[in-house]
């Protein structure tokens, strides 16, 4: 495969969800390619059938499409180096492993699970790190052939050099070296004939012409083994970009198993996809130069400015408050029509009576940080909640339950006027304001009680006249009359 352009790949395992760290890897991989007019490849690594979850491939497709991380080659659209599903590439891996055996760079290992367990138990008892002891590393060729002919189970192991060092250069962490003596003879082909994750990764990356490998820093320790495989085959080694972990706090990694949010969870809570992607990009990466102080970036912006030298070595702490702030900014930037379209499903889940959604959204949008918190603000529309008349007391508005009764009685004829257009919020407000002036009172003295009478709450998405126009004349008059009756005791 010619390497005349940058080729990156996102290679997830279909385990059922897209956690934040995975999505960040996908994003950085996409940006690395697109910033350089390169090719972004999607490869599904489904060889670990024990972790495979039905429908998980669709989760991967849907997440990448929703976030705009569209691939140039992949399982559904094909490409010049397919197939792009690892389980469909099984035939080739064993051939490559056997090539290494023939060249003396790998070997058949016949050690049983029982022997390995006993070996590791003994090593642990002596305070040693568990490792393979090379028992089958130098078996005579005749013995190997005899045991293979007898059908004895085996794995194929890489023959790691016992001396020297293996080093590599990472675009984030710099030059790293490991003593070969510290590395185990890793398994390439398992007893069932399936390749190990590491081996399949190297072979597939080579055959697909991958020039830049972007992954989590947990793979730093495996990279020397990857490089020894590239060297054994005489293949070009890709550029490595290892990203710092995403942490829940200083001690704990973000983990779905610990109940931490996946991408789907965040969307289900009402975070906007664009905001999630923006925030995730900033987890361990910082813009440079004129963009250093900027926090809001569209995907198109990121394609223009993203470079790997902005990636930090330090772990990134997932900050829910920062995500909220970025999400709130994205909500504020929506047009009224866009906000209504996004908020409407949440409104409909909470309100089943006719209301003026356009006016409701005009009041919600400046205050809303997360769409999922909209329903709890609307629980009074369908049915008036129980409330205590002490709510009418407000020092700032200079109201008491007694003055509230007076205010509502004064408002009743205003709101009952058939000529008053409840579809025009300003008209209703002006009529109420005129009544306040007539009484020699401030607007709040009249309108604060109206808000309580219509909602039974101090905090609502809009003031009294807003709520009246959202609910309409009939509901407004019913609730004002009920409030007067309640205040009469």
Specify the residue positions occupied by each region the protein language model found.
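Small-residue-rich helix-loop
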Residues: 336-439
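N-terminal Rossmann-like or analogous alpha/beta NTP/dinucleotide-binding catalytic cores
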Residues: 2-125, 222-235, 275
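Charged substrate- and nucleic-acid-binding regions of tRNA-handling and nucleotidyl-transfer enzymes
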Residues: 426-488
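Glycine-rich phosphate/pyrophosphate-binding loops
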Residues: 34-46, 199-212, 233-247, 460-466, ...
């Amino acid at each position: 495969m010619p390497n005349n352009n940058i080729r990156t790949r996102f290679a997830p395992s279909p385990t059922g969800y897209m956690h934040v760290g995975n999505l960040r890897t996908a994003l950085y991989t996409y940006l690395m390619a697109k910033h350089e007019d390169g090719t972004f490849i999607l490869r599904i690594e489904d060889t670990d059938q024990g972790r495979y979850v039905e429908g998980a491939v669709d989760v991967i497709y849907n997440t990448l499409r929703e976030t705009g991380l569209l691939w140039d080659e992949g399982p559904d659209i094909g490409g010049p180096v397919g197939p792009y599903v690892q389980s469909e590439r099984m035939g080739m891996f064993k051939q490559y492993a056997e090539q290494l055996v023939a060249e003396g760079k790998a070997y058949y290992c016949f050690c049983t699970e029982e022997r390995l367990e006993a070996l590791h138990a003994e090593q642990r008892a002596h305070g040693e790190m568990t490792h393979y002891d090379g028992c089958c590393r130098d078996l005579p060729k005749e013995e190997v052939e005899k045991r293979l002919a007898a059908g004895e189970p085996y794995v194929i192991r890489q023959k790691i050099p016992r001396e020297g060092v293996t080093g590599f250069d990472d675009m984030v962490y710099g030059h790293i070296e490991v003593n070969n003596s510290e590395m185990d003879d890793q398994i390439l082909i398992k007893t069932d004939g399936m390749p190990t994750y590491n081996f399949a990764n190297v072979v597939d990356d080579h055959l697909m012409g991958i020039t830049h490998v972007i992954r989590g820093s947990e793979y730093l320790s495996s990279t020397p083994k990857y490089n020894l495989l590239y060297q054994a085959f005489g293949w070009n080694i890709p550029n490595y970009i290892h990203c710092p972990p995403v942490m829940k706090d200083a001690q704990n990694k973000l983990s779905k198993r610990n109940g931490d949010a996946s991408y789907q969870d965040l969307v289900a809570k009402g975070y906007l996809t664009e905001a999630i992607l923006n925030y995730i990009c900033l987890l361990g990466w910082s813009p440079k130069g004129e963009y250093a102080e900027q926090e809001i970036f569209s995907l198109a912006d990121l394609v223009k400015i993203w470079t790997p030298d902005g990636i930090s070595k330090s772990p990134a702490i997932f900050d829910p408050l920062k995500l909220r702030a970025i999400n709130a900014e994205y909500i504020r930037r929506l047009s009224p029509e866009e906000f209504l379209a996004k908020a409407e499903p949440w409104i409909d889940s909470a309100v089943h009576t006719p209301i003026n959604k356009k006016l409701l959204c005009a009041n919600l949008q400046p205050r809303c940080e997360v769409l999922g918190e909209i329903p709890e603000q609307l629980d009074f529309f369908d049915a008036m909640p129980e409330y205590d008349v002490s709510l009418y007391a407000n020092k700032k508005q200079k109201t008491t339950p007694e003055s509230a009764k007076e205010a509502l009685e004064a408002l009743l004829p205003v709101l009952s006027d058939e000529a008053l257009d409840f579809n025009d919020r300003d008209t209703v407000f002006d009529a109420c304001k005129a009544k306040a002036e007539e009484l020699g009172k401030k607007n709040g003295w009249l309108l604060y009680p109206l808000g309580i009478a219509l909602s039974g709450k101090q905090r609502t998405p809009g003031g009294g006249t807003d709520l009246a126009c959202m609910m309409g004349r009939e509901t407004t008059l019913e609730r004002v009359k009920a409030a007067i009756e309640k205040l009469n005791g």
